[in-house]
Amino acid sequence: MVKKNDVVSVVTTVGEFIGKYVESSESCITLNDPRMIVHDQTGMGFAKGLCMTGTEEPELGHFYNGQVVFMDKTNERVEKAYREFTSGIVL
């Protein structure tokens, strides 16, 4: 069971996102401090927001269920990297 502030991964039809779970409803999943997952030849990383041209460091992100494939608790290694990226504190 996912609890408030658990770090979760949301897979949508357009990409994968990570953030702290706030709530879900019939229409959407809401994350706090959400980030888009990005990939390049060196590996995986985090964008500063939800899209390449969007607001940096958004407070909330709403993912509408029509585009969500699934949500899962993020694995420990990626959660640690996300927390370091969003807080600036190396754990």
List each language-model region with its residue ranges.
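Conserved RNA-binding domains used in RNP assembly and mRNA/RNA metabolism
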Residues: M1-L91
